[in-house]
Amino acid sequence: MLDDTIAALATPPGEGGISIIRLSGSQAIAIVAKVFKPVKGPDLTTTRSHTLRLGFIIDPVSGESLDEVLVSVMRAPHSYTAEDVVEINCHGGALATSRVLQLVLRTGARLAEPGEFTRRAFLNGRLDLAQAEAVLEIIRARSSRGLTAALDHLRGNLSRKIGELNERLTGILAALEASMDFPEEVGEVDPENLADLRRILAGVDRLLATWEEGRLLTEGLKVAIVGRPNVGKSSLLNALLNQERAIVSNIPGTTRDTIEETLQLGGFTCRLIDTAGLRETADELESIGVARSKKAIAAADLVLVVVDLQTGIQDEDRRVLESVRDKVLIIIGNKLDLVAHDINKKLADLESFAGNYPRVAVSALKGKGLDELARKVQEIVLGGRALAGSDEPLITNARHRAALENCREHLASAIKAWEEGLPEDLIAIDLWSAADYLGEIIGTTAREDLLDRIFSDFCIGK
């Protein structure tokens, strides 16, 4: 219902610097005016939009002062929801905030449902559906590049691309249906429409091609550190984390289980997994660790194969490399600081061992080469494609990907039917379905149950 006024806590519950209670709806200003006494100046109902007022929240029944607050007023349509919005900035105590919220609810507001503020922004035309989902992507972003992609969506770059494709598609549909309804006046459909349909399909394919990178931005890159025992895998993990997370020892087999930590590497969120050294062992506990390492490697998006530059390439290193050749790899020569002699030979051996795989020499102990490693990770993930300023927005949402895949299926079917000379009404059925799937992304054809599912993922105050 858009004819009532909603309220909710817009900041995390508990103690903090401030707590913000947000109201939206036609009665938002009037409701707060009944419980807000400004320190000076006129009543809140005459306050100009986008201004702050200092005062006290007073219970009109008991006359008790509940908190000293700052109240901001944003009048429709120039607000997040395109409705009148009031935000009450309370002191950050849980009790004071709760009492103010309860008073607001007793005075005429209704407690908002999860995501209802953003849903109102969508229903009032302030945001389309892809932009509304971008709000949640911004909140959940775990990397700088993920945040950049989410902001790109919020600015409407994805929506514009989808809208352009949909507009061209509906134009072809209009021509096709006019040809069916008025064959004598309109004549046959221009063959150029088929060529444009192929271009629309290519545009959908370009968007789908960004999904893998988009998935890594939202889910994080699974990175396994592997190698024979005692090559410095745990030291590398500690160096990347800049903390002593894993036990480091000269005794082979010290790491007997996988250790997982999250960090930023090359602008991406990486779920870094330090694995037990890969070798044949009679030790039961170490064998369990090796088995878990193999499972982690199988699930990894990227594998860092670590070798010891000090001791040089060993047969065991070659066996490790052979066991992971089906993965995306970076070869890391560690302990560069301990190579006192023949450094050029050691690096040449590393190059020969790595072959066509990217390689980098590092000193986990001294922190040398880690920036180069981050760049290698970035190059592999982006594949030479720069995220910022790209013409093609990234697909980071699994719902968008599914809609595009369904759209593609119907476009391909329509093109095939057109090429085979099948009846125009059959072609139109596929084209309408393709257009509906594009509309689902930006919300022009979204069903109520889909909206319920999307906005239920939001917190109550958003």
From Swiss-Prot:
Function, as annotated: Exhibits a very high intrinsic GTPase hydrolysis rate. Involved in the addition of a carboxymethylaminomethyl (cmnm) group at the wobble position (U34) of certain tRNAs, forming tRNA-cmnm(5)s(2)U34.
Designated name of the protein: tRNA modification GTPase MnmE
Amino-acid positions noted as binding (6S)-5-formyl-5,6,7,8-tetrahydrofolate in the UniProt annotation, renumbered to this chain: R22, E87, R126, K462
Source organism of this protein record: Moorella thermoacetica (strain ATCC 39073 / JCM 9320)
CDD domains reported for this sequence: trmE, TrmE_N
Family, similarity comment: Belongs to the TRAFAC class TrmE-Era-EngA-EngB-Septin-like GTPase superfamily. TrmE GTPase family.
Gene Ontology cellular-component terms listed: cytosol
Subcellular location: Cytoplasm
Pfam families: MMR_HSR1, MnmE_helical, TrmE_N
InterPro entries (UniProt xref): G_TrmE (IPR031168), GTP-bd (IPR006073), GTP-bd_TrmE_N (IPR018948), GTPase_MnmE (IPR004520), MnmE_dom2 (IPR027368), MnmE_helical (IPR025867), P-loop_NTPase (IPR027417), Small_GTP-bd (IPR005225)
